[in-house]
C-alpha cells in the first residue's frame, strides 16, 4: 500500500515538474511572441477552446489578449491576427515575410506540400505563376470564359425548370453547375449532370470540405499526429480525398496517352507540355505529383466556395424577401427577360452587386483563412515571430469589423451602398484573402457569382417551406470553413 502511495506521489511530482518545465520553455522560446493563454503539455490550449465554434473561441480570446495573440492548438503554436488593421499589416504591408503557407492538417494528409495551394517557396511561386498564366490562356477573365459560364447557366435553368416547383435540396444542382466551369478548363470538357462518377466526385468534395468545419475536424487540426492512426470521421475524409486524387490521376494518364504538344486541350495538357520542356532541369517543379495536386487544388477550390456561397445566398434571400424583390426589380429593369445576363451588366446594377457582396461577407466561407507561415524571423508590431511561425489571418474578423460595417452581424446590403444607392467598395471585403497568397481564382469566382446569381433570379423566385421568420440563417458549422444549414426550397418560374 505504502509503495503504491509513493509511486502515485512520484508520478504527480514528475507531472508537475513537466508542466512547469513546459511553461518555462514556452516562455523562454517565445521571447517577444504575442501574449496568449498558457498552454499545457501536448494539449496546448485545448481546454480553452470550443471545437464546435473554433472561430468564436479564438475571437473571445482576442477580447482578453488583443488583436494579435498566440494560441496552442495541441502542440502546434499559432499566432492569430484579428481585425482589418492586423491582417492588412501582415498580409499586405509585410507581404513577403507572411507569404509562407501554414498547415491545414486534413488537406496536408493528401497534398503533403505539393500543388499550388499548400506549397511553399520556389515551388509555390512557379506553380502559381504557371497556373495564373494558363488559366488566362484558357479564357479566364475574358469573353471566352463568360460564354462558358452563360452556357452552363442555361443548363442549370433547364434542370431547375425540370423540378416543376417541387421542394428540392439545391446543393448538387449548384455544385454540378459551378464545377463544370472549372472542369471545362482543367479537363477540357463538362460533365453530364447525371454522370454517376461526377456526382460521386462532388459528394467526396463536399464531404471532405464539411469535415474541416466540424468539431472532429478542428480536433484533427490539433492532434493530427495521433488521430490519423485512429478510427473516426477523419478516415472517411481521407478516403474521399484519396478518391479525388485517384480520379485526377486517371485523367492525367488519359491526357498523357493522347497528348498533342502543339495543341493543348486543357490545363492538364499545358502542364504536361511544360513537363516535357523542363525534363532536363534538375530543379524543375513541373512533374506528375505537382500536376495531380495542382489540378485537384483548382478543381476543389473552383467548385466548393462558389457553390456554397450561392447556397447560403438563396437561404438569406428567403429570409429577406424584400431583398429578393429589389433584386428582381433591378434585373427586370436593366436586363429584362429576353436575354441572358452579361458580366458588364453589373456596372448598372448596384443593388444586385451589393447583395452578392453582402452574401459573401455574411457567408464568410473561410473565416480563419488558409494558414500562413512567416518564412524568416519577422518583427511584427512590438513582437518577434521566429521563422516558421504559423499565422491565422482571421478573415471573418475583417468581414465583421464594426469600423467598416455598421451592423456586422446582420445581413444588410446597405453595407455596400452609398447614400445615393450606388455600389461602394470596402477595404474590409476580403473573402478571397489579400497579399501574395490571395486567391488567384477571384476574377473567375466573381464572374460566376454574378452570372449564375442573376440568371437564376431572372428566371425564378424562391419559396421556402418555412415562413421567413422561422428560417435559421446561422451556420451549421464554423471551423476552417463556414457551412450553411441543409435546407430545401422551390424554384418557381417567374
UniProtKB/Swiss-Prot annotation:
<dbReference type="InterPro" id="IPR002401">
    <property type="entry name" value="Cyt_P450_E_grp-I"/>
</dbReference>
<keyword id="KW-0349">Heme</keyword>
<dbReference type="InterPro" id="IPR001128">
    <property type="entry name" value="Cyt_P450"/>
</dbReference>
<dbReference type="Pfam" id="PF00067">
    <property type="entry name" value="p450"/>
</dbReference>
<dbReference type="InterPro" id="IPR036396">
    <property type="entry name" value="Cyt_P450_sf"/>
</dbReference>
<dbReference type="GO" id="GO:0043231">
    <property type="term" value="C:intracellular membrane-bounded organelle"/>
</dbReference>
<dbReference type="InterPro" id="IPR008067">
    <property type="entry name" value="Cyt_P450_E_grp-I_CYP2A-like"/>
</dbReference>
<dbReference type="InterPro" id="IPR050182">
    <property type="entry name" value="Cytochrome_P450_fam2"/>
</dbReference>
<comment type="function">
    <text>Exhibits a coumarin 7-hydroxylase activity. Active in the metabolic activation of hexamethylphosphoramide, N,N-dimethylaniline, 2'-methoxyacetophenone, N-nitrosomethylphenylamine, and the tobacco-specific carcinogen, 4-(methylnitrosamino)-1-(3-pyridyl)-1-butanone. Possesses phenacetin O-deethylation activity.</text>
</comment>
<protein>
    <recommendedName>
        <fullName>Cytochrome P450 2A13</fullName>
        <ecNumber>1.14.14.1</ecNumber>
    </recommendedName>
</protein>
<dbReference type="GO" id="GO:0016712">
    <property type="term" value="F:oxidoreductase activity, acting on paired donors, with incorporation or reduction of molecular oxygen, reduced flavin or flavoprotein as one donor, and incorporation of one atom of oxygen"/>
</dbReference>
<dbReference type="GO" id="GO:0005506">
    <property type="term" value="F:iron ion binding"/>
</dbReference>
<dbReference type="GO" id="GO:0004497">
    <property type="term" value="F:monooxygenase activity"/>
</dbReference>
<keyword id="KW-0472">Membrane</keyword>
<dbReference type="GO" id="GO:0005789">
    <property type="term" value="C:endoplasmic reticulum membrane"/>
</dbReference>
<feature type="binding site" description="axial binding residue">
    <location>
        <position position="439"/>
    </location>
    <ligand>
        <name>heme</name>
    </ligand>
</feature>
<dbReference type="InterPro" id="IPR017972">
    <property type="entry name" value="Cyt_P450_CS"/>
</dbReference>
<keyword id="KW-0560">Oxidoreductase</keyword>
<feature type="binding site">
    <location>
        <position position="297"/>
    </location>
    <ligand>
        <name>substrate</name>
    </ligand>
</feature>
<dbReference type="GO" id="GO:0020037">
    <property type="term" value="F:heme binding"/>
</dbReference>
<dbReference type="GO" id="GO:0019373">
    <property type="term" value="P:epoxygenase P450 pathway"/>
</dbReference>
<keyword id="KW-0256">Endoplasmic reticulum</keyword>
<dbReference type="GO" id="GO:0005737">
    <property type="term" value="C:cytoplasm"/>
</dbReference>
<keyword id="KW-0408">Iron</keyword>
<dbReference type="GO" id="GO:0008392">
    <property type="term" value="F:arachidonate epoxygenase activity"/>
</dbReference>
<dbReference type="GO" id="GO:0008389">
    <property type="term" value="F:coumarin 7-hydroxylase activity"/>
</dbReference>
<keyword id="KW-0479">Metal-binding</keyword>
<keyword id="KW-0503">Monooxygenase</keyword>
<dbReference type="GO" id="GO:0009804">
    <property type="term" value="P:coumarin metabolic process"/>
</dbReference>
<dbReference type="GO" id="GO:0046222">
    <property type="term" value="P:aflatoxin metabolic process"/>
</dbReference>
<comment type="similarity">
    <text>Belongs to the cytochrome P450 family.</text>
</comment>
<keyword id="KW-0492">Microsome</keyword>
<dbReference type="GO" id="GO:0006805">
    <property type="term" value="P:xenobiotic metabolic process"/>
</dbReference>
Amino acid at each position: 500500500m505504502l509503495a503504491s502511495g509513493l509511486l502515485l506521489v512520484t508520478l504527480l511530482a514528475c507531472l508537475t515538474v513537466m508542466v512547469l518545465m513546459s511553461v518555462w520553455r514556452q516562455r523562454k522560446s517565445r521571447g517577444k511572441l504575442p501574449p496568449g493563454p498558457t498552454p499545457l503539455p501536448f494539449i496546448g490550449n485545448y481546454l480553452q477552446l470550443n471545437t464546435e465554434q473554433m472561430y468564436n473561441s479564438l475571437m473571445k480570446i482576442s477580447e482578453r489578449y488583443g488583436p494579435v495573440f498566440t494560441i496552442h492548438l495541441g502542440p502546434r503554436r499559432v499566432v492569430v491576427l484579428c481585425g482589418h488593421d492586423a491582417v492588412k499589416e501582415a498580409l499586405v504591408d509585410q507581404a513577403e515575410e507572411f507569404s509562407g503557407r501554414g498547415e491545414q492538417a486534413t488537406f496536408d494528409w493528401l497534398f503533403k506540400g505539393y500543388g499550388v495551394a499548400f506549397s511553399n517557396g520556389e515551388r509555390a511561386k512557379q506553380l502559381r505563376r504557371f497556373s495564373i498564366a494558363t488559366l488566362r490562356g484558357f479564357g479566364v477573365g475574358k469573353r471566352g470564359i463568360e460564354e462558358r459560364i452563360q452556357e452552363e447557366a442555361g443548363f442549370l435553368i433547364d434542370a431547375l425548370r425540370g423540378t416543376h416547383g417541387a421542394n428540392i435540396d439545391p446543393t448538387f444542382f449548384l455544385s454540378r453547375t459551378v464545377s463544370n466551369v472549372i472542369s471545362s478548363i482543367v479537363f477540357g470538357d463538362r460533365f453530364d449532370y447525371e454522370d454517376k462518377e461526377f456526382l460521386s466526385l462532388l459528394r467526396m468534395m463536399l464531404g471532405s470540405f464539411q469535415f474541416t468545419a466540424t468539431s472532429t475536424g478542428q480536433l484533427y487540426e490539433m492532434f493530427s499526429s495521433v488521430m490519423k492512426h485512429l478510427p473516426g470521421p477523419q478516415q472517411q475524409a481521407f478516403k474521399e480525398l484519396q478518391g479525388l486524387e485517384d480520379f485526377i490521376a486517371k485523367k492525367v494518364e488519359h491526357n498523357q496517352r493522347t497528348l498533342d504538344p502543339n495543341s493543348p486541350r486543357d490545363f492538364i495538357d499545358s502542364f504536361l507540355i511544360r513537363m516535357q520542356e523542363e525534363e532536363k532541369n534538375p530543379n524543375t517543379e513541373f512533374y506528375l505529383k505537382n500536376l495531380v495536386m495542382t489540378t485537384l487544388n483548382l478543381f476543389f477550390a473552383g467548385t466548393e466556395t462558389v457553390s456554397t456561397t450561392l447556397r447560403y445566398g438563396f437561404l438569406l434571400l428567403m429570409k429577406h424577401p424584400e431583398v429578393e424583390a429589389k433584386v428582381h426589380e433591378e434585373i427586370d429593369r436593366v436586363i429584362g427577360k429576353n436575354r441572358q445576363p452579361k458580366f458588364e451588366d453589373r456596372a448598372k446594377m448596384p443593388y444586385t452587386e451589393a447583395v452578392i457582396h453582402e452574401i459573401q461577407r455574411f457567408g464568410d466561407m473561410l473565416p480563419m483563412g488558409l494558414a500562413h507561415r512567416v518564412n524568416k524571423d519577422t518583427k511584427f508590431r512590438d513582437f518577434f515571430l521566429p521563422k516558421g511561425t504559423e499565422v491565422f489571418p482571421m478573415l471573418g474578423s475583417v468581414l465583421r469589423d464594426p469600423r467598416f460595417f455598421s451592423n456586422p452581424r446582420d445581413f444588410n446590403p446597405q453595407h455596400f451602398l452609398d447614400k445615393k444607392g450606388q455600389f461602394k467598395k470596402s477595404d474590409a471585403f476580403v473573402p478571397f484573402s489579400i497579399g501574395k497568397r490571395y486567391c488567384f481564382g477571384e476574377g473567375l469566382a466573381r464572374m460566376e457569382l454574378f452570372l449564375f446569381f442573376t440568371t437564376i433570379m431572372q428566371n425564378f423566385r424562391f419559396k421556402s417551406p418555412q415562413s421567413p421568420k422561422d428560417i435559421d440563417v446561422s451556420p451549421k458549422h464554423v471551423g476552417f470553413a463556414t457551412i450553411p444549414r441543409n435546407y430545401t426550397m422551390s424554384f418557381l418560374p417567374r
